[in-house]
Each structure stands twice: as C-alpha cells, then as structure tokens.
Amino acid sequence: MAAAEAQYDLLVIGGGSGGLACSKRAASHGKKVAVCDFVKPSPPGTTWGLGGTCVNVGCIPKKLMHQAALLGEGMTDAESFGWEVAAPKHNWETMVGNVQGHIKSLNFGYRSDLMSNGVKYYNAYATFLDPHTVEAVDKKGKVTKITASEIVICTGGRPRYPDIPGAKELGITSDDVFALKSPPGRTLVVGASYVALECAGFIKGVGYDTTVMMRSIPLRGFDQQMAGLCKTYMQEHGVAFIEGAVPTAVEATPSGAKKVSWKLADGSVGSGEYDTVLFAIGRDVCTSAIGIDKAGVKLSSNGKVPTVNEQTNVPHIYAIGDIIDGEALNPPSATTELTPVAIQAGKLLADRLYAGKSALMDYSMVATTVYTPLEYGAVGLPEEEAIKLHGEDNIEVYHSYFKPLEWTLPHRGDNVCYAKLICLKPEGERVIGLHVCGPNAGEMTQGFAVAIKAGATKAHFDDTVGIHPTVAEEFTLLAATKRSGDSAEKSGCUG
C-alpha cells in the first residue's frame, strides 16, 4: 500500500516540552505545523503518552514522589507541634496510581492543546528520507510520508544501561520507577547523578531500604561542596552508599531477588541482594535511529547535535532540548537538558522563523534545583568553575550555615542547611553564582535568579531587607567570607 503524503511549513520531531512549545508558537503565527511523537517501550516494557520525559518520567512524577517523602517527614515532625499522629504508613500503589492518573490527564491536555492550536499530531516514529522528508510509521504499521520547509528535531534522550550481564533483563531506570505497580522493596540505585540521588531520596523517604552505588563523585557538574552536603544529609537519614564501585553483573536468585556483583577501585569485589535495581548512570540522546545522516545533519562524537542559535549545519533543520551539544555552545552550557530551557528555546525559535523577531536563547544563568531530601538550588557558576574561569584572587565567596525556624521544635540538626554567594570582585562583586541547600530551595532560587540575571551585586543583596523569619533572608545577611576564615556557623536567628 502506498504511503500517505502530507506537506507542512514546519515539522517537529519529538513531542516533549520543547517540541510542543515550538509547534504551538509556530501555529500561532499562522503556519501549517505537524508533530511526530512515538515512545519506544523501555526494556521492562514501560511506555507513556504525549509530553516527553518531564511530564511522564521526569520532573512531574519525581517532584510528586519527593513531596510524598516530605509529607512523611512532616508527619514525624508534627508531634513537636502538638499533633497526635498515629504511626504513618505509606501505600506505594496508591501513590503510583494517583501520580499516573495525573500524568494521563496531562497527556490528554497536550493532545487537546495541539488540536485547538491547529497542529497535526502523528503518534508515529519519524525517520529522515532526505533533508526535507521523513517517513512516519505508527504502531499499526501505517506509513505517512511528510515533507516540510523547516524541521525541528527534539527527540530527547533515554536512560543508559551499563553493558553488563543481566542489566536490561533485571534492572529498571527512571523510565520505569514512577509506574512500578508494586513497592520497590530493598533498592539499589546505581549512579550518583541528580536522577540517581533524587530517586534514592524519595524511595528511602517513603520507607524502603535504599543503597546508592557510585563510581566517583556525586552530582557531577554541580558545585561539589553543595553536592557533598546533599550526600551527607542522605547518609545521615539512612541512605547507604557504596563508593568507588562499578557493577559487574546482575543475576536472578531463587527467592526472586536480584544479586548484584560489583568491583571496587582497589580491585576487591563485593555483592548484595536487592528487590529492585535502578540504573541512573546517564542518558543517551535519541539521534542514532532517526536517519539523521540522510538529512545531512552532523553529530558530535557523543551523538548530540552541534548548533548555532538552535540551527544545525543544514540551514532549514534545527534542534532544541536534550539533543543539543551544550559543550559546543559559545560559551559551553550544561543547561540544554532542562525542560524550561527547551520550552524557551522552542518559542524563541518559532518567533524568529515566523514572526520576524530576533531574540536568542540565553543558556547562561539558568536556575535549577535538585530534589534530594535536602533540596539544592543553584543559579550561575559552581565555585570550582568560577575559580577556574576567573582565578581565585578575583572571587569572593560569602557563606553561612543556617537552621530553618521550622526545624527548631523537632530538634533537627544544626548547621545542616547552607547558603553561599559567589561574587566577581573586579566587577563590583557581581554575583555569578548562588547556591543553597535547604527546604524549598527551588522556590527560593527562582526569585534570586531574576536578580542575578539582571546583574545584581553583593551590595544589592546587602541593601535588601529580608523577610523574617524565612530561609531566603539568609542571602541578605551573608557576612562571612571563605577567604577571611571566619566561622560560617549560626548561633541565633537575628543575624
């Protein structure tokens, strides 16, 4: 049977946050737009609807499960505030059912949005036939040949499995954990990325024994002092860590558990049995199986797409989101994989293509948060990178430990939460990095990101009167510098 054919002004390959934003914005400018999106099942068979990683297996479910863990912590604290609380019991199935129900409502909403914006949606896997044409195949095998004047590739990425026996047969990834129909039980999380630590945090937080196996450092690419604080807090709250280790095999046991063998840096070996083995060792971009060579688009050695203002080496083909090679940007950036970045880049690209606008995506000074049990919010440079770029003599770091008021009655730890500003001395102590570990770190960081984006200096922070008692006010009170050697520990709540 001959393939159906269709012609569009813009074809978007990938229905994640960036692709959807770009397609709807282009349609609002009167263009004929189509989106192709198709989810190949994970090795355990998990699949999902329209919306990409963030909605289905990323930001949304992980934040909801992080909240589940925080609620459990809050119930423990409640007695200190006078509440008589029976021993709380968590129901994994209820949580997963409600989370998946919410995700499905979002999937439906995205499909409705495309329809109401006049965007044609193909639930089909697209591969290039030539620079202007793709072949889209749906789950029933129906083939549609689609041509477009411009094409945007935003196919995202998928979790990587280690190349060891039993990994794909017996392990899961973040593609699967949010839809697990039964509790994870004793869980081994392999990796120390933000995905690894976030998953380990909420699994432990809702009541399951959790171990993290890490090869080297936690939260690579983030400020390492802050990463250490996140890790220490997790250890103090019951998450075990196997450090300097790499898994070598996963085997099924007669009891139904998974036996994981590993090798340590000193050459010694070890093993343990777990009910769930979750791999979070990184992600691979989805560019290898879309016929991108037939489009003439060049790839970096890591499979990502080098771009200039989202444009590839083929003038009418663009890329946004995870697949952009952030290291090839000028300056390099690690923010290309963030959902809000993809959304912003997609909208701005559509405006440049079809509305005569000129605004470009700025990948610098983008705020982010790691939803570990002790949340970590950041905007700007890690301390190590600031020193590397500008020299230690040109950097001033203001810092302080603090204890949220809410932690006082339950007698939570002192000098656990921490805030620091990284300032560039030759530019009037312009703030080039802000980092905080503490409750609601994301909510706090978002507001400060606006100020830092606008060029705020340490003097601006000092001149701002804080809201008392809040966690955020710590940034208006910072006085001790690392250079001075003065103590950053706090003994009271009034500066």
Curated annotation (Swiss-Prot):
Entry keyword set: Disulfide bond, FAD, Flavoprotein, NADP, Oxidoreductase, Redox-active center, Selenium, Selenocysteine
Annotated catalysed reactions: [thioredoxin]-dithiol + NADP(+) = [thioredoxin]-disulfide + NADPH + H(+)
One Gene Ontology cellular component annotation held by this UniProt entry: mitochondrion
This protein's record includes keyword Repressor: no
InterPro entries reported in the protein's UniProt record: FAD/NAD-bd_sf, FAD/NAD-binding_dom, FAD/NAD-linked_Rdtase_dimer_sf, GSHR/TRXR-like, Pyr_nuc-diS_OxRdtase, Pyr_nucl-diS_OxRdtase_dimer, Pyr_OxRdtase_I_AS, Thioredoxin/glutathione_Rdtase
UniProt modification remark: The N-terminus is blocked.
Pfam annotation, one family: Pyr_redox_dim
Cross-link (Cysteinyl-selenocysteine (Cys-Sec)): 493-494
GO molecular function, one term: glutathione-disulfide reductase (NADPH) activity
Top-rank lineage group of the source organism: Eukaryota
Cofactor details (free text): Binds 1 FAD per subunit.
Disulfide bonds: 54-59
Protein residues bound to FAD: 37-54
EC numbers: 1.8.1.9
Cofactor(s) this protein cannot do without: FAD
Activity control summary: Activity was very low in selenium-depleted cells, but increased 4-fold to the same level as in selenium-sufficient cells for 70 hours after the addition of 10 nm selenite.
Active site: 468 (proton acceptor)
A GO biological process held by the record: cell redox homeostasis
Top EC group: oxidoreductase
Complexes and interactors: Homodimer.
Family: Belongs to the class-I pyridine nucleotide-disulfide oxidoreductase family.
Miscellaneous comment in the UniProt entry for this protein: The thioredoxin reductase active site is a redox-active disulfide bond. The selenocysteine residue is also essential for catalytic activity.
Protein name: Thioredoxin reductase SEP1
Organism: Emiliania huxleyi
Gene coding for it: SEP1
